[in-house]
Amino acid sequence: MKVILKEDVHGLGRAGQTINVKDGYARNYLLPRGLALIADEKNLKVLEYQKKKFEEQAKKKRQDAESIAERLSALELTIKAKAGEDQKLFGSITAKDIAELLQKEGFLVDKKQINISEPIKRVGEHEVEVKLLSNLSAKLKINVVAE
């Protein structure tokens, strides 16, 4: 029997795939638990429609992320922090601080999206990576000045 998986099923396939399984397995396990649908014409059309809709949403999301990446790359944040004589900061600037500054600038960025190897502890220019999608990131310039 051909079925369309609604969820990922270990050993069978991923959600959205059309697979062949034994009739009993489909009737007694997959269908009652809501893991699959019978692959009839109606359900296949619905699946195609959902795939197209998902692809359009992914494309729009990618375009939005690319425009945000472009704006972030052009942006240079200036952060004022207290520093000692040797240009060392009292405290440090973390991903959370950068995320808050970006939110004040109008960017909805979570601190988990900011890739910073270690907190910034010195005055000067620094470059931070902001991960927007799994394969798209932007370089953000941060200028730390002493108060």
Curated annotation (Swiss-Prot):
Keyword Ribosomal protein recorded: yes
InterPro entries: Ribosomal_bL9, Ribosomal_bL9/RNase_H1_N, Ribosomal_bL9_bac/chp, Ribosomal_bL9_C, Ribosomal_bL9_C_sf, Ribosomal_bL9_N, Ribosomal_bL9_N_sf
SUPFAM superfamilies: L9 N-domain-like, Ribosomal protein L9 C-domain
GO biological process: translation
GO MF term set: rRNA binding; structural constituent of ribosome
Domain of life the protein comes from: Bacteria
Keyword rRNA-binding tagged: yes
Keyword terms: Ribonucleoprotein, Ribosomal protein, RNA-binding, rRNA-binding
GO cellular component: cytosolic large ribosomal subunit
Family recorded in the similarity comment: Belongs to the bacterial ribosomal protein bL9 family.
PANTHER family: 50S RIBOSOMAL PROTEIN L9
Function: Binds to the 23S rRNA.
Name of the protein in question: Large ribosomal subunit protein bL9
Gene: rplI
